[in-house]
């Protein structure tokens, strides 16, 4: 296939605006998917956690054959926490499809990824999706997107963008919202027409940059990237140059292209194509592969600095080793080193003792996805409260700030604004939609937002929507930020909890455990109704007497206890507390 028949595009969207569904429909209608995948939804999100959370974490590649052209499509994560993924992906493509919801319009994460695309000089194609939603307002959305591009400093070509309307769920698209085709073909035709073929030289010596890695126990490390010059064949000798400019020899075993979602071995790949290669050990992201006769490194890829850190430590609670398989500091260290290979935005440093590691990432979500993965792989660990990473600039302490958009019902506006004020947030904008809901935009220091999400859901009775995205590093705000108001109930005994004592403890606060659960000394068993910590005994049984009672036993009714998810537990703990994470349970304890 000649270069002129090749198109490389990335799909950008805010969380939940439907980009993974859109790719599904393109795959089905172009006839690229086989029968077994035809029925399943969101084929692209193949990771367990992606299916459960309904978000995309890892960037994926796929390709579609359409009218004798090949379109390589890369799906990117919308969360700013996975920004490390987004930047690498954009280095492989020539244009982006910006997907925006026809009701919500552009959201903060859309802005984050669009800024990255503009920095790379890519021209966008706007897809206004979910056009069939009640309350769709495509003209308003179009104006909003134009204003956004203008604010981000787009040039004339970027501001003169093509627009197409679609409903990915129904699998239809059209250049006019009133006149939709029966399928997605207008979108595919628009991509062929508006996206330039890759500007590369397929005659020169080989040059290719690795922009993503995968691992497979059968072939080892798999490098994914786009060939910028020349051709590559299996069993070819290459020189690998890493970001420190040191060179070593290597041999490529297999060369694989994409067909739909599957990787297929190809006899040769040429410049402009996105491919995977195997056979070279210890590949790193942003390594350059080149022909031994002409050694030239490509500029290294940049990734945003981490903003949040946590301490991972060996689980040293009395229950250590009961539920997990990997519990030693060596297991922990090896697992974190393995994660560093393909998780670019992660940093790991040795802590203040051999069994502690300081792990930094792009946000709470980024790190909690890693902890959840480790938990599923039978690891046990203790995790401290998330902290923001501060920097010193010209003798002043700077901290990360985030832009937050909150969508709530009018009646909750007062309590949310008061809480945000205590967390040192500045209100930037506010627009009521006239139907009983209001949209608030804040700029707030990240350390004030740790632990806000769970109280926000309680405040709005679960009806509020909140999205946040890293904005910049700015001068740190003075003064203490709002902390947890209540103390905790700490167990001072170690056996099974009993309903009799839990029933009597209910007057003191909300319990985190039910009847018949094993506890240990120092474990947090509930939330105190006052602001101090209280040692309690949840294992006390009723004293038996030898006098026969005539039905004087009271009927013990326990209020349902609070069960924390991993994210809620991380947000709940204070500086002197830990979250104990094991494959079977999540416990809170004092250090």
What are these regions (language model features)?
Residues 35, 107-108, 133-139, 171-176, ...:
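Switch/connector loops and helix/strand junctions flanking conserved nucleotide-binding motifs
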Residues 208, 215-220:
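A contiguous, basic/glycine-rich beta-loop/short-helix subdomain that forms a polymer-engagement track
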Residues 16, 22, 54, 73-75, ...:
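Residue-level signature of catalytic and energy-coupling elements of molecular machines
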Residues 10-11, 127-135, 172, 176-180, ...:
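Conserved short loop/turn motifs at secondary-structure junctions
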Residues 86-100, 105-149:
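Conserved P-loop NTPase nucleotide-binding/switch module
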Residues 1-100, 104, 144, 213-216:
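P-loop NTPase switch module centered on the Walker A-proximal segment
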Residues 162, 189-193, 197, 223-591:
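Accessory interaction regions appended to the cores of large information-processing enzymes
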Residues 123, 133-193:
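Canonical P-loop GTPase G-domain recognition
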